[in-house]
């Protein structure tokens, strides 16, 4: 199936990096290498890329993209395109990986579940961004992953193809192999529409 995303202009470093990779054909043949039901689908890892036989392709992917976290304007509601990154201990500036991205799915929250989640986030002693009432309403309406807010750059959103994201997030995975799908879910082709 097809997934159409819009990239945010107020995250220009991430937008431009993603478009550069799309236009180079980098994502063609990559897989969604990490899939966690009711959480997210992650793709773009260089090591998963299928190389075209008879063609030498070399990409410089040994860089990071400076964080462009614009919270609360962009939060981890369902269908957000976000940049993966190393954890806080290795990466206190929250710089993004050069190629890895994820699309959020998360769960739909009832008012009671949302209240429980917010209280848990407040009491865990981690530096979570506690969602405002308006953002909580968004999570109850659309679903999402609130514990990632203000920790990762959200740089776009799915405009069409959420049903494809849903199918991918429901595939069988190997939990002992970093949640890799048992059968490869391949990005056949990524192109810039406009």
Pin down the residues of each PLM region:
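Cyclophilin-like peptidyl-prolyl cis-trans isomerases
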Residues: 1-194
